[in-house]
């Protein structure tokens, strides 16, 4: 909350394993903060997410952070940001985006690198004045796209999304539909409604068009479903959740060192934890393999490795197999997943990239110069 405004700030992942998630989150917002380190400059993931934001026509505010670093090179980083916007074919308005200079650790922001800020008011003022308010008729029939899910032991699965139009209320009867599955039709009820306040959630009675809210009461709600007023069922388009591409087997640790590191070592502990993860991660697939082993399929190595590390830190002890690529039989042929990779590199790096992709059975489909890069 800032003055008379409520500002929703949503973070996005940058890794390709979560590419669909980036696009779903960007559809919930009206503008973006392009956060750039004053020493490191724009990173590869910065380019990936910014390109998606520009394609959606979002307004951009450039924020150069960590200006208090000893190795800060603010002027050079600003030039790199402008080159990035130019390379990504930004519109004239996006190219003239306002720029702020911050130190998040000190909680200060200023309009010039030569000024020393006092607080973050310049950043919030720029957001209020430059980013458009969400559009949507609060009197129209309610419509909301579920862009993310969460899970709570007390209320079960929680849907998160932005109200596109109308007003959503507690105890409201709703229809649930799916853009990619016209045959899916169900009814539900909003049992509880929450607004986001900082990192927490506060219960509310109703929310209007443009609000980002969380709701509970529908056990099988998932990403991509549209919640509508029953009198006007109209699904919203969304980016489909990617199918799993690799699989690993999680099993009980039966090595000579079993039971020495973790607190939770039995197959029942492992099963319960994986079932809990399925409630909040819709792109994970788990199948039982005998009594002590589980096949866990995900979107990529990073996706599964994050789960493994999280469970290890929680005190679970288990062993994992090497990753296996998942294949599909399409029209009688066995097909393996492929990744369409777009590398944006300086001319000097082209040879190294082509060589490394060749080792992974990569086929070069096209090579186009964009400015001084390929």
Label each residue range with its predicted role.
Residues 59, 68-132:
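Canonical P-loop GTPase G-domain recognition
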Residues 96-98, 125-129, 159-374:
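Accessory interaction regions appended to the cores of large information-processing enzymes
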Residues 9-11, 25, 33, 46, ...:
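Residue-level signature of catalytic and energy-coupling elements of molecular machines
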Residues 5-7, 12-19, 26-50, 54-76:
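Conserved Switch II/interswitch segment of TRAFAC-class P-loop GTPases
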Residues 17, 43-44, 69-75, 107-112, ...:
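Switch/connector loops and helix/strand junctions flanking conserved nucleotide-binding motifs
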Residues 21-24, 28, 45-52, 76-84, ...:
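Alpha-helical scaffold elements adjacent to nucleotide-binding pockets in ATP/GTP-utilizing enzyme cores
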Residues 63-71, 106-108, 112-115, 164, ...:
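Conserved short loop/turn motifs at secondary-structure junctions
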Residues 1-24, 86-90, 95, 102-107, ...:
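P-loop NTPase nucleotide-binding/switch module
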């Amino acid at each position: 909350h800032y003055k008379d405004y409520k500002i929703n700030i949503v973070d996005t992942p940058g890794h390709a394993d979560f590419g669909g998630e980036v696009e779903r989150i960007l559809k919930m917002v009206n503008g973006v903060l392009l956060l750039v380190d004053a020493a490191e400059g724009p990173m590869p993931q910065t380019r990936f997410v910014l390109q998606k934001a520009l394609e959606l026509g979002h307004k951009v505010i450039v924020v150069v952070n960590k200006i208090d670093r000893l190795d800060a090179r603010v002027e050079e980083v600003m030039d790199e940001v402008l080159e990035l916007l130019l390379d990504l074919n930004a519109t004239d308005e996006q190219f003239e985006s306002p720029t702020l200079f911050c130190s998040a650790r000190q909680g200060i922001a200023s309009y010039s690198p030569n000024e020393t800020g006092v607080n973050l008011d310049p950043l919030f003022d720029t957001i209020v004045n430059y980013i458009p308010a969400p559009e949507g008729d609060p009197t129209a029939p309610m419509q909301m796209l579920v862009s993310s899910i969460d899970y709570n032991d007390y209320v079960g699965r929680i849907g998160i999304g932005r109200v596109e139009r109308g007003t959503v209320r507690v105890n409201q009867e709703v229809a649930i539909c799916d853009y990619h599955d016209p045959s899916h039709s169900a009814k539900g009820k909003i049992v509880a409604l929450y607004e986001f306040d900082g990192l927490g959630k506060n219960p509310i009675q109703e929310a209007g068009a443009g609000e980002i809210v969380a709701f509970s009461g529908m056990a099988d709600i998932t990403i991509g479903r549209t919640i509508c007023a029953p009198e006007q069922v109209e699904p919203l388009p969304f980016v489909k959740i990617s199918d799993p591409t690799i699989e690993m087997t999680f099993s009980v640790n039966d090595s000579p060192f079993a039971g020495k590191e973790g607190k939770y070592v039995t197959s029942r502990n492992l099963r319960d934890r994986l079932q809990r993860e399925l409630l909040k991660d819709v792109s994970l697939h788990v199948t039982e393999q005998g009594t002590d082993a589980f096949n866990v399929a995900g979107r990529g190595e990073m996706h599964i490795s994050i789960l493994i590390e999280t469970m290890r830190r929680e005190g679970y002890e288990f062993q994992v197999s090497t990753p296996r690529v998942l294949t599909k039989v399409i029209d009688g042929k066995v097909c393996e997943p492929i990744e369409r990779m777009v590398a944006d590199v300086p001319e000097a790096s082209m040879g190294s990239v082509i060589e490394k992709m060749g080792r992974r059975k990569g086929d070069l489909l096209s090579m186009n110069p964009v400015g001084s890069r390929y």
